[in-house]
């Protein structure tokens, strides 16, 4: 094997390892989120832990033709400028024939609090930026860890979810 072939093979091998590690890291984080939120499959448990429907947000979020989100049970005490992978600010419950089922978690930072930090970049979690919901004035990121979302784990709207 000549030197150039050996060098190219080495670079390809290193890139493959980096990609595998990155994918494993992301999957590992999703597994951590699932373990941390498994206790909240019942809304009663979420309520006991401080998550609840909030005035004005106490309905099923639906975007006809795009998908739904469901009902957001929010821990108002957790709304600050920090996000914690294992303690999401909201549990998102989806309607089902058997009642509400945990479908996703949501990370939330109020825009006014984030702006007060002086940061010019949106907040981040796991190397990804939260995005601004201009209607609600919050930075958000959904993680569909309990209900498959064919559009992606991190997408807001899930075409597999609809509101009654």
What are the residue ranges of the model-derived segments?
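Bacterial N-terminal signal peptides
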Residues: 10-18
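Positively charged n-region of N-terminal signal peptides that target proteins for export
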Residues: 1-4
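Primary mode marks residue(s) on the alpha4-beta5-alpha5 output face of response regulator receiver
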Residues: 25-164
